[in-house]
């Protein structure tokens, strides 16, 4: 925060700056206290400022991305100055690791904004992520921006100064304010000057407390040429696997950041806009919808005719599965991004208040609270007859007594909290509980003591893992080598059973979604909208299908020949397949 304060003081010492645009990453971890501290400094500016969140503000957000909007007044902005429209949107990824993605709600807002902008008005657009292929839905954003006279995009993320041109649109990727920014290694910022007579734009670096640097970028603004084509994702994969066909598809108006539960007839899911919904599994037809008071990144759970889901408004909701009517609501006092587990009439779920709860499914009464959680909880717990197991974004993993919530043991992953066992869903087999953490390490912990039975980086997974139906194999999706790895879950060492290459041309795959299976296939998610079905023996990819260019949240088998999947940009797709 010291570097930001020095930057603000320097800006206030000048009389030639009209406004400030901050292109995201105002925090390291998106914690409420970090956002509040940054906001306090920004509020000291003597000129207006406009801000969008970056990936560090949204990926690890304990509030489910609510606090940024609450503290700064929103995640998108638009204003006019000297006949130019300046606008900006968030680019996430919100809560789920993957490529950046402008939320669907923001694209809809941006489209309405550009449609209402006078013809020919120059547009300068800000997004934390550069407008290249690392922004998963960049083509959709350009489709909107190119309806108007887009002149320039501004971005951060790289922490260094770059002048680029993406799909015919000049792009300024600017330095951070941090003194660690190369090559200068001093606190600073960029000053953009626009001559509105000649429409000539210059960018110079300024060292806080020092002199203006030389101009390092120049852009001549002129009417955008709409004949320049936009680069689009490649969907040719779908032609290679005709044995996988779409049964039905549904597009939400908001992002989806979670997966499904089912009663066999209906599917239950939630949107980032805060709605819990039910649709028919075989047709995708709407059944009911229930609106909560916050955003939702929680997977619903189904049991005994009831649907349980948590919201970032701080409540756990229990709804009638048939009609969506509220049965009970359980307040926790702080936002929840965790996914509930229901076992034997008890709901187990963590929150962002440093707590983990057991709630009676029938009454909604709290049975016990464990208040020793460091950080916040994101994943779904796993339970055996005696204990429930869950990790947190405080580098800790807990085994709690199911009867009273007593801490049985605690494991700690030393080092950065970004290596926490928090996004992976833990799985159990025999006397082991398995976790895969972001330093690309997989561990088997003793369920009774928490001691490491084995540790290995050979599976090369980041967070996405699952267990076979018979509990004999642990599945891990690799981060860098585009493979599904099966590990012997019975052995007391990391014994690789097989590796199956996946038809993925990305340099890395970060999607944290759990790996599911049925009797004939293992279903593997990706961060670029691809779904893979791998044979149970790992000998081949049965089929693969690209649904989107964004993160796959969940792939749930409906039967032995049908699955349903959701994508971060709000798609739900039902797929039927054969084993040809």
State the predicted function of each range:
Residues 1-37, 118:
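N-terminal active-site segment of His-dependent metallophosphoesterases
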Residues 162, 169-237:
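Binuclear metal-dependent phosphoesterase catalytic core
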Residues 280-284, 320-324, 360-364, 401-405, ...:
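Short loop/turn segments that connect beta-strands within beta-propeller blades
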Residues 241-261, 287-301, 328-343, 352, ...:
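Extracytoplasmic beta-rich repeat domains
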Residues 32-111, 115-119, 140-152, 162-174, ...:
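Extended active-site neighborhood of metal-dependent phosphoesterases/phosphodiesterases
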Residues 547-580:
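Blade-level signature of beta-propeller repeat domains, shared across WD40, Kelch, NHL, RCC1
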């Amino acid at each position: 925060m010291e570097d930001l304060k020095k930057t603000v003081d320097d800006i206030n010492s000048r009389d030639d700056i009209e406004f400030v645009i901050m292109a995201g990453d105002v925090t390291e971890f998106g914690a409420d206290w970090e956002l509040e501290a940054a906001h306090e400094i920004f509020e000291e500016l003597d000129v207006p400022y406009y801000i969008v969140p970056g990936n560090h503000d949204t990926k690890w957000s304990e509030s489910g991305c609510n606090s940024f909007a609450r503290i700064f007044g929103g995640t998108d902005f638009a204003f006019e100055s000297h006949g130019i429209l300046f606008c900006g949107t968030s680019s996430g990824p919100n809560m789920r690791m993957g490529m950046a993605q402008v939320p669907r709600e923001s694209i809809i807002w941006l489209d309405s904004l550009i449609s209402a902008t006078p013809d020919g008005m120059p547009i300068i657009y800000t997004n934390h992520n550069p407008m290249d292929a690392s922004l998963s839905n960049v083509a959709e954003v350009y489709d909107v921006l190119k309806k108007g006279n887009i002149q320039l995009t501004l971005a951060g993320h790289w922490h260094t100064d770059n002048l680029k041109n993406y799909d015919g649109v000049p792009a300024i990727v600017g330095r951070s304010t941090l003194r660690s920014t190369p090559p200068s290694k001093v606190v600073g910022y960029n000053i953009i000057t626009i001559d509105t007579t000649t429409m000539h734009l210059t960018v110079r670096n300024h060292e806080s407390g020092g002199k203006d640097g030389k101009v390092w970028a120049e852009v001549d603004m002129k009417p955008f040429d709409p004949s320049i084509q936009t680069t689009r994702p490649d969907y040719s994969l779908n032609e290679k696997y005709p044995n996988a066909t779409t049964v039905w598809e549904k597009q939400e108006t908001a992002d989806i950041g979670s997966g499904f539960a089912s009663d066999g007839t209906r599917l239950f899911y939630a949107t980032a806009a805060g709605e819990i919904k039910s649709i028919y599994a075989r047709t995708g037809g709407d059944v009911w919808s229930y609106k909560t008071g916050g955003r939702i990144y929680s997977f619903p759970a189904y049991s005994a005719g009831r649907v349980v889901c948590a919201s970032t408004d701080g409540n756990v909701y229990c709804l009638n599965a048939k009609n969506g009517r509220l049965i009970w609501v359980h307040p926790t006092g702080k936002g929840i991004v965790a996914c509930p587990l229901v076992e034997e009439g008890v709901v187990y779920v963590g929150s962002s208040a440093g707590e983990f709860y057991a709630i009676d499914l029938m009454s909604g009464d709290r049975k016990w609270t464990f208040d020793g959680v460091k950080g916040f909880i994101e994943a779904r717990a796993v339970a055996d007859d005696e204990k429930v197991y869950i990790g947190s974004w405080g580098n800790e993993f807990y085994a709690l007594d199911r009867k009273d919530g007593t801490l049985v043991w605690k494991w700690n992953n030393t080092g950065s909290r970004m290596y926490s066992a928090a996004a992976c869903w833990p799985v159990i087999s025999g006397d082991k509980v398995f976790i895969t953490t972001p330093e690309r390490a997989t561990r088997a912990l003793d369920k009774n003591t928490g001691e490491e039975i084995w540790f290995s980086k050979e599976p090369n997974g980041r967070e996405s893992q699952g267990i076979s139906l018979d509990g004999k194999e642990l599945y891990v999706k690799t981060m860098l080598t585009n493979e599904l790895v099966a590990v012997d879950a019975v052995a007391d060492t990391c014994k690789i059973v097989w590796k199956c290459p996946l038809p993925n041309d990305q340099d890395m795959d970060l999607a944290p979604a759990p790996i599911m299976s049925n009797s004939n296939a293992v279903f593997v998610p990706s961060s670029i909208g691809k779904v893979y079905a791998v044979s149970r023996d790992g000998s081949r990819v049965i089929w693969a299908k690209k649904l989107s260019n964004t993160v796959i949240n969940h792939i749930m088998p409906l039967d032995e020949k049908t699955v349903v999947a959701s994508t971060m940009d709000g798609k739900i797709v039902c797929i039927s397949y054969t084993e040809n």
